[in-house]
Every structure is written in C-alpha cells, then in structure tokens.
Amino acid sequence: PVFFYKTGKIRHTRSPISRNFSYLCSVVAFIPTIMMYMEEVKRIPYGVSNFVDVIEQNQYYVDKTMYLPLLEDQPSNLFLIRPPRFGKSIFLSMMSAYYDIARKDDFERLFGNLWIGSHPTRLQGTFQIMSFDFSRVGGSREQLEVNFQIYCTGELNIFMNKYHDFYSDHIRAQFEAAPTFEAKLQVILGEAHLRNYPLYLIVDEYDNFTNVVLNEHGENVYHTLTHADGFYRNAFKKFKGTFDRILMMGVSPITLDDLTSGFNIGWNISTKQQFNTMLGFSETDVRQMFQYYKDCEQLKGDIDEMITEIKPWYDNYCFSEESLNRDPKMFNCDMVLYYLRQKIDLGYSPKQMIDPNTRTDYSKMKRLLNLDHLDGDRKGVIRRIAEEGQIVADLALSFPAKDLVNPELFTSLLFYYGMLTIIGTRGDRLILGIPNNNVRKQYYDYMLEQYQNKERISLNDLKNLYDNMAFDGDWRPAMEKIAYDYKENSSVRSLIEGE
C-alpha cells in the first residue's frame, strides 16, 4: 500500500500509477514537511559545548564550518578573543572533531550535513589533537601550581590513551614515568617530532585561569605566574615552536600580552574582518533556527515580531572596523538560545529577557573592574558610557595587567568583555557603544551598586512609590519624595547655575 498526503489528509491507494497519479505529483511539494515529522525534532543545545554530543544527540547546530578553510589560510598560531557566551567552546570542539586523526572515519557522520561536508580540506583528519580548557583550573594561592599540574597531567593522560597506537611501549613507559606535566609533554613532543606526527594545540579559556588569579589573589600572584619563571608562563614557552598549529581563545587580552614575550609567535585575529561573524549568531542564523522550530510546530508566533523583540536585547555586536558596513551585526548565542527555550517551553517570551546565568559573567567582569578600586577617571568613563551610550577611543589589541588602571585602556577592556562594541568611526579612532539592553542594564546595575556603597537607598520603597504612581495614579508621594531628596542634595548655587 502507498500513502499520499493531500490537503492535510492521508489517502490510501493500492494503485498509485492509475487513479492516484495526480496525487503523486502533489505529494512532492510536501516531502520536506513529511520528512520533518518523521524525524525527531532537534533539541536546543543550550549550555552544550561538545560538538560531537550536539550531532550525535540530534541537537540543533548553527553551521560555522565554512570558517575552517579561512583559518587554515592564516598563520599557524592564532589567538581569538570574544566576549563570554559567544560560542567559543563549541567552535573549538568542532575543530577538534574535524582535524582529529582518531575521528577521520567519522567525517561523513559528523560533518556530512554541514558546509564542510561538501568542501573538505586536505588537513581534515590529519592531526593528533591536544586540548586544554583552563577554566577548569583554580584553587587557593598555595594550590594553584599543584592544581595546574593535576589538570594538565590528566589531559595528557587522555591524549596518550586516545593515540595509544601511535606510541610504542617504550615511549608510553617513559611517559608514565615522567614526574611532571612538563616532562610528560616533552616525551610526547619529542616522539611526535621524531615520527613526523602533526600536532594541533587547542586551548579554550586560555586567560580564564589567570583572570581568576588576578581577581581573587591580586596582581603580585598573577605576576609570579606569568613572568620570569612562573609555571604558567613556562607552560606556554613549552608550546612555542613545538606544535604544527595552535589556536587559543579567551575573553580578554590581558594574559595574551603578559605571555607574548615567552610565546611571541601568536597571531591575534580578534579584530580581523574575515572572522567578525565566525562566533555568535547572525540574524540569518537566528531566523533559520526559529523557522525550523516553527515548521516543527514547536515555536508559536510571528518570527519577524520575535526578531524585533530580541534585537534590542541580544544583538548589535561588531568586532572589526572593516565589518561596519559590510557584515551583519552579531547576536549573543546563549541569549538567543535562552529566549528560544523559554518561548517554546512556556509559549510566551521570558519575563526576564536577560539570562540569569550571565550574572556570573557580570560578577567576574565587575571584580576585574574593581582591581585597586576604580579611580576618578575610570569612574568617569563608566558614567559617561552609561549616560551617553558611547565613547570615542583607540582600541588596544592587548595590554599587560599592570596597565589595567590606565583609563585610556579601560575602554578596550570593556570592548573585549562585550560591554562595548564598534558602532562607528571618528577620524582614525573608533566610536564604541553599548551594544544592547542586556549590557546597558549591567552598566546601570554597576552604577547603582557604586552609589549604594556611598549612601544606602531603599530601592524597594522607591519601586513602591513609582508603582503606586503608575498603576494607581497616586503621584503625590513620589513627587514629594523626589522634591525632598533634590532639596537635601542640592545647593542654592546649583539652582542659580541652572544645574
């Protein structure tokens, strides 16, 4: 028996060649819809950073594989800096799966439906991949080096188990006997060089460990790790000249600058136009994703209205001056997925448009801003940005931690953390602006905290007054409160001068 779809009904026929030939023609237009219903709807990959899991567990993936050939055309050792929650980890995970010689035969299964599946490069499946995620390292001041050794040694053990067949019993015995991470690494590097094994080093959150140290333990401890014979600096010196290709990603340029004298072969592509849209979602990406879930009858509502709703909150990131008039602005990945998940699960937009999980990112940034306490100049920078929404500045590609207190570099730090983005030019300088409401609220919250530290104000009482004015028309108490506070905090001269 054959079943044909027509006008929402299923029709049964024993002879599709005779009476139902016309249905055979009409059904062709419905094949994509039928196939979509036959397949399991893809899950939303919120918070998932493992590319193989996304593919194998039937989760939605926004294809970024077209950037792999562009990266291959760059120098062999690269750095890229992007704000938190912009898809760095899953991109690096995708790269690992693509170049891993241990997954060479998985290419069609993992990448067959992606852009690179039809455009494979000669480097696909040719590397042994060594990966580190330094966000997993932390601890007390006394335990930092020990924890670093434990984590890195564990990753090397995973590497040796994965590529077991490439190394002889003798080499594996040497590896096991090596007492430290550096010694184990040297065993691998020596044998790989001797045997001409191509090695690819991929480091996620290369700056996270040191940023945490800077925040929690201060500049002196940070300086000890990243200068002279500091163990973190020494690790990067081991990487120098020993890997065929290297890609490192992070959220700030601070560690990059402090380590470059020991690791001076990295090429910073953070502001290169070719990679402006490599991380994050374009509006086209978002529309295609929303359309997919609408076609699956998971997402209700008008897509244009949804885009209009989320753009002021999650969009408008630009990381390259050359991209201003040629590339689309970029959405924050996790924010879009947060909205989509809420919209599908609840049937309406989230009451709070800001993902609560981003509060941890804000807390990290706030601690970094408060190093040595904000001086007057830097407070003025934040106040000006909060009030005017933009500032004209030169963008520094990197700078050492000791220069964090320099107000001229402060705007660059805000840019790399995603608190400012490129919105225009003025002469040879950039106009950096607040990208969206999500970030704008973080500025206001920060300013409010600073004011609260000076004089505590009951915000709940203020909210009650404004709510009574807005919802009940009871405006007198709110106006009296404003007039009283103005009188208490203003001088006669302020009135004379018109302030």
Regions inferred by a protein language model and the residue ranges of each:
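P-loop NTPase motor core
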Residues: 104, 108-158
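N-terminal pre-Walker A segment at the start of P-loop NTPase domains
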Residues: 43-69
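Amphipathic alpha-helical segments of the small helical/lid subdomains adjacent to P-loop NTPase cores
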Residues: 255-262, 269-341, 381
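Substrate-engagement module of ASCE P-loop NTPases
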Residues: 188-192, 222-244
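Extended alpha-helical interface modules used as scaffolds for assembling large macromolecular complexes
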Residues: 266, 329-499
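Pre-Walker A (Motif I) flank of P-loop NTPase domains
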Residues: 74-78
